[in-house]
Swiss-Prot record:
It holds the Pfam family Plug. The lineage of its organism: Bacteria, Pseudomonadati, Pseudomonadota, Gammaproteobacteria, Enterobacterales. It comes from Escherichia coli (strain K12). This is Protein YoeA. Residues 1-28 form the signal peptide. Keywords: Signal.
Length: 130
């Protein structure tokens, strides 16, 4: 079934469609800019991401240049130089265990070492577990 649409309504609807496309493109561009500006991810023991400058704790940053210049075989080897970080090899298929100030993350080799730190589960050792 064909409808007879007046030319004025067609032009206005086409114009509004074009304007909405421009606005959505501008919104997408600004969100991409936000993502590219936030390159530093802070990994804490409570598994949440936060801004580096808003954190109340002492933070060590290993930047991309340091990782590129490093001769270490893994990220775990780079983390060994940070105070409060202890790396142990539990010899289960080459997995490493990382303790950050007494907190142990049993799945850290799968998540942090594969650059997915938000899924790592951490727990605090009690005196009887050491």
């Amino acid at each position: 079934m064909l409808y007879n649409i007046p030319c004025r309504i067609y032009i206005l609807s086409t114009l509004s469609l074009c304007i909405s496309g421009i606005v959505s493109t501008a919104t997408a561009t600004s969100s991409e800019t936000k993502i590219s500006n936030e390159e530093t991810l802070v990994v804490t023991t409570n598994r949440s991401a936060s801004n580096l400058w808003e954190s109340p704790a002492t933070i060590q940053v290993i930047d991309q240049q340091t990782l590129q210049n490093s001769t270490n075989a893994s990220i775990a080897d780079n983390l060994q130089d940070i105070p409060g970080v202890e790396i142990t090899d539990n010899s289960l298929a080459g997995r490493k265990q990382i303790r950050i100030r007494g907190w142990i993350c049993p799945y850290i080799s799968r998540h942090l070492l594969s650059l997915n730190p938000l899924q790592a589960r951490c727990r605090r050792y009690s005196r009887g577990e050491r």
